Amino acid sequence: MRRISVVPASIFSTTIRTLFVSAMALTASASLTSLFPLHADVLYLNEGEEHIGNIEKIGDGKIGFNEADGTKHTYVATETAHVLFSKIRPGDEISQVASITDPLVREILAKAPTAAQHPDSDYVTLFRRRTFTFRPDGSVLHERRKLLKILKEPGLDEANQSIFYAFDREKPDLVFAHTYGADGRVTHLTDDALSDEAIFSSTPEYDRLKKLKFALKKVDIGSVIDVLQRIETIPPTPLRPYVIDATFGQREPVLADEIVIEAPKNLALCIKTYQWTGNAPRMTDTVNASGNRVISWFFSDPKGYIPEQNMSSRSRIFPRLVITPETSWNDAAKAFKESLDKAAPSPERLDAFLTEAGIASGSQMMKAQRIYEAILKKIRLVDLSCFDYGGYDAPSADVVLKKRYASTFARTVLLYHALRRIGLPVDFGFAASWREGGIKREIPSLGQAEDALLRVSIDGETIYVTCDSDYLPFGHIAPAFQGTAAAFLEGDTFTFAITPEGDAVKNRVDQQVFVKLAANGSVDVRDVRCFRGPFETGIRGIKAAKTAEKRISAENTVKRVHPKARLIDFAYSNLDDLEAPVVLTLSYHIPDAALTASDKLMAMKNLWVNFESGSASLASRTYPMDCFVTSETTTTVVIELPDSYDWVPWNRTFSYACSFLDFGASLTQNGRTLLFADRFRVSRKTFQPADAYPQYRACVSAMADLDNQWIVLEKADVQATATPAQKKMTASETSHTDSPGNR
């Protein structure tokens, strides 16, 4: 689920985070600091009570303790569990909800809804304010305050939170984290519930991201949690940009949600809104007493939304706000070009790698494929995006060749310089997933980009290449980047293009099944499955598995055909050959695959037609539906019939066709052979509720009808003497509990 991100987007936790320091909270902080140093002692009693303050004296079996409110108390040592030295935070001196003086919190708690008012919600966001203060030098103070109430057990997960940050240019601070219990007690976060973790410490070249984890204490159903966070940044650059990308609305109710931007009047901001219809946030634009421009957007959605299967990304459905300091694509292009040139490998090291890749002979296409495959096989992939890397400064290709591991971005930099070395025209590009809307030209910042890709010209053919999978052939880009808007460096600027969709050649699955049906209803099967494009990556990943593990995988595959299926043999094609499709060949036996009502009548399901209709189970939709990729699948089943048996024809067709969907199936008998064939093609990935989805559902319904049909066989002498009613007998009325639908 997409949430507000400030590029590098993943430096923030997957929960939306911005914070707000109220005047009352600041006052409380100042008064607390005057009473105690920055750190304080937390005294834990055996009964579970927590007391915050300072230890004055320990002796004679007693502990003298100064409470946070200034009172003094003496505790018996035997009633004390332990003492923790912890940072003292604003509000830590308050132990009871009745003692809270912050008017904001008092008002929110007084009006907090009950679980009965939101019976379908796990929690409700009572208040959230995200404040971004831009300073004259371009640095930003990003603050977030959030109060939410836990209504059901799944909502307890909200007690565990994280702050992601790029430690080389950002400084996080957890100002406070309080739990307001349903019993009126207030519990505070202490330093033992905090941990600061590096994410990519094992790969120091990419180790910019850290995570500050914390867990609020004593969170239970009915509790309200109140968290205040802050991240302070250094000034951004074209290759370390700052982008605010916020989508309003979430599954759980949001009673009050506000984004506030404060910036000098002379700082130009690029502000873009999307899906700004219906329940759009209300905007105000003023100038404060300091002369700074203050823009705020307020949003409320007391209902939340009910998610639908395969629904489009929130950022393409709900109101979306994107803000970045005004700059230009030319500035980004100039900075990145300098970075890309600087990252070039030394000629000696690059030539050694090209020799290692085996490009001494062959066409330019063959050389490009060998270089690409050498990078996939010899440069271990570090799975992190440009967001995780924390910027768009090109990683050194020399370091990649020396260390032999790299991110997708770094792999792409190496491939770029290698292809140029053999004389191929190549453009370096960046892309964002089509599900998130791709790169938007009207937002002049690389901060939108998730990862890198190349556009190569070979023998007059334009080929797009990504390096984010070890198993995709050269020219087969990842599904996320198929049909998306990408930005390519050309000369002194970035130009924009839509990457090609997958087609019936690159995204496809073909299955050929040869079945010998015995008179007792058992079958012997030879099942050949051919995968191309994104469907082959999972199969190729099994190449490193042991033979026993491969056999278990094959056994599981045939069990999905029929629970009684028994694997006889299996084989894979050469999984190291990326240019050839992946082929899996299975041989198996299924006893009782067909039902025998008598010695002259037999019926069986077409076990190799398996449609799942979950994606079209809704009669109507509120939100658009996305499918994985544009693709084509075909199935051919050849059944050798037992002696004297003939198929009882269906006398009906199963097909559906429109401009972006095509399904057809046929079943015919030729001699002793029954031949089934079907084909399903989809050339659109997003289906709007009012027009495209009804057509998608109609197509899936036709496929579901086919899935419900039984193949009925009769001996020839019975067929010859049967009554007209018997000849028309089919099992199409037979109920079947499987969920049919899209393959």
Task: Map each language-model feature to its residues.
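Short, conserved helix/loop micro-motifs enriched in His/Cys and acidic residues
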Residues: 351, 380-404, 434
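Cysteine-centered nucleophilic/redox motifs
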Residues: 146, 223-225, 259, 371, ...
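Compositionally biased alpha-helical segments
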Residues: 35-128
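Secretory-pathway-linked proteins and extracytosolic
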Residues: 78-79, 84-115, 220, 232-243, ...
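Long hydrophobic segments that form regular secondary structure
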Residues: 491-593
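Hydrophobic/aromatic-rich core segments of domains that either
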Residues: 409-499
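A surface-exposed beta-strand-loop module
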Residues: 175-246, 283-318, 512-514, 565-600, ...
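Early extracytoplasmic/domain-onset interaction patches
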Residues: 90-163, 501-529, 566
